[in-house]
């Protein structure tokens, strides 16, 4: 008996937080797009997402990373309203605005100053602190061998499990199909993937493929 062929406009390999968020954003921008997510473990016992710390910070040295972090922090702070589903319990990500603190030795102060200047120029609340200011703000810290610190009080962390399930439930409500299977091989042309072969014998055909598979 021939195995079924599953057809999508976009097929996403991996249903962790990246795969589910990609699926949601595709559907939010193009609701008519047929999206399928292939995930072998619906319990997420070994998923990369659940091994994450959930930290979100703007303290990066490249503008692209800073912009992505600014978007992410704003998105997570408003996650409940963005992921709301009529008649369903709101998504909980337990956002904690605990701030981030980076410290450097004296020879790295100039680099930290450049990074903070870039972050400030992009509208981020990041404060450069001298060793004396570090001691005042964090009395338990030994600052004798420090050159400076950078504190971003509006950074924080969230619950990765809540983030994952918020995206997954929202994507499912938008019509994303979740396929409980493992990708075992791909049929490839010289410059593109044509189809995915699953462990149950099914074949996934799509116009576009996204690799969101994690390390586990």
Where are these regions (language model features)?
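Glycine-rich, N-terminal phosphate-binding loop of Rossmann-like dinucleotide-binding domains
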Residues: 15, 60, 105, 213-214
